[in-house]
Amino acid sequence: VPMKNSDASAVESASSKIYVGVCIDTACTLGVCAERNAIFNMITNGEDAIRRVFAVNWKGEAIPPCGACREFMAQLMPEDYRSIEIMMDQEKERVVTLGNLTPEWWL
């Protein structure tokens, strides 16, 4: 059952198309984060390269991807994941790369 106040995400693909997703939380922890949901949407539409990720909580504040989402992006783009841009603070326009968040990934 989705939470009433849920996170949402937008992913910009390498082709500059925007894909969106929402967080689907369940009582049994088998939910899917908004970022992965947006990436699944991108993959469903035939794309496999991420340029930027932007996620917000129910208050509209930018939030970083969780460890599972970081792992998924790294596995999806093992050669290029370090270049994916992540919005950390929209008011201050602070952007970091996934490589900054995960500098010594195991891949």
Residue ranges and their predicted role:
Residues 4, 23, 61-64:
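Disulfide-bonded cysteine motifs in exported proteins
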Residues 41-47:
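Alpha-helix C-terminal capping segments
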Residues 1-12, 17:
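Short beta-strand scaffold segments in enzyme catalytic cores
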Residues 47-107:
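C-terminal binding/interaction regions
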Residues 33, 37, 68-71:
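Short amphipathic alpha-helical face segments that pack within enzyme cores
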Residues 14-25, 50-53:
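Glycine/charged-rich beta-loop-alpha catalytic/anionic-binding loops adjacent to active sites
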Residues 22-36:
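Compact, glycine-rich, soluble single-domain proteins
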